[in-house]
């Protein structure tokens, strides 16, 4: 029943009572375009054009035993703006939100063929059902990956480690400027800072694989990495403070009396996982028992 859906840690029905930060339609629309299911971003214009085209055609009549709702049917001269799966339109049958064999084939086919998915870890995971996945990022034994993906995963892990050190230092500054110095946070930073210095991470190699919206983000990362490597903590703090002021403006927290540091809720006190938990839940559903409508 629906009660069981709420308890499942799956893509559909997961944490259903939680507040949604982003409009789901925005997220789904982006995903549909990425996987080539939605073939054009101008969806509403395409729907209007399709509707106008269909209404301009002579009315066709079908007998009662003919299929009257076949989304995959090609319309002459009509652009198919969306790729549709095979759907059973007999709504008198019992149905489920679990994936059917046809659903899975449709999803795998689109991920395998989508331009944005070529050379990605997601495509490799979907196409290799035998690949064991761990619950936490990085999630896959690097020895089981081809060289390009192994390096990509390693760089992602290094970027997560690097940003964790930066976030720890941010909280150190925030606690000192907006409340009481958080000694535990300073201890954490000291440990992770030392670990970073001995990790051999080359920030330029890492940034070569990171997609950032603007060059100033990469410049910030390089400046921070240099400060961490040379133990220039005062310069590091200044760099972080300037970055927040430039990006957040009046919404900045450091030095802003409208905010106070709470040691129970530090800012970004976690390592980036690149939404691995969602990927794992999605793949578990894809590999799980197939449902059948009816």
Q: PLM features: what roles do these ranges have?
A:
Residues 8-22:
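Short helix-coil junctions and helix-kink-helix linkers
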């Amino acid at each position: 029943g629906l009660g069981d859906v709420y308890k499942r840690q799956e893509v559909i029905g997961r944490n259903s009572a939680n507040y949604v930060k982003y409009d789901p339609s925005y997220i789904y629309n982006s995903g549909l375009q990425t996987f080539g299911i939605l073939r054009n971003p101008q969806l509403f214009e395409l729907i209007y054009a399709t509707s106008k085209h269909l209404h301009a055609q002579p009315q066709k009549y079908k007998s009662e035993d003919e299929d009257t709702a076949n989304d995959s049917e090609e319309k002459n001269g009509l652009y198919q703006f969306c790729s549709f799966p095979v759907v059973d339109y007999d709504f008198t049958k019992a149905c489920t939100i679990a994936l059917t064999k046809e659903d899975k084939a449709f999803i795998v086919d689109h991920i395998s063929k989508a331009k944005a998915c070529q050379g990605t870890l997601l495509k490799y995971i979907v196409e290799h059902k035998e690949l064991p996945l761990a619950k936490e990022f990085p999630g896959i034994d690097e020895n089981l990956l081809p060289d390009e993906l192994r390096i990509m995963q390693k760089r992602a892990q290094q970027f997560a480690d690097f940003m964790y050190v930066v976030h720890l230092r941010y909280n150190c500054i925030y606690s000192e400027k907006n409340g009481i110095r958080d000694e535990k946070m300073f201890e954490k930073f000291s440990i992770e800072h030392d670990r970073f210095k001995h990790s051999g991470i080359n920030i330029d190699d890492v940034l070569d694989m990171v997609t950032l919206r603007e060059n100033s983000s990469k410049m910030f990362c390089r400046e921070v990495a240099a400060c961490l490597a040379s133990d220039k903590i005062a310069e590091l703090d200044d760099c972080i403070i300037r970055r927040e002021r430039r990006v957040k403006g009046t919404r900045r927290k450091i030095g802003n009396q409208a905010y106070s540091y709470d040691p129970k809720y530090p800012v970004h006190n976690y390592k980036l996982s690149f939404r691995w938990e969602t990927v794992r839940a999605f793949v578990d559903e894809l590999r799980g028992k197939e449902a059948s409508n009816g």
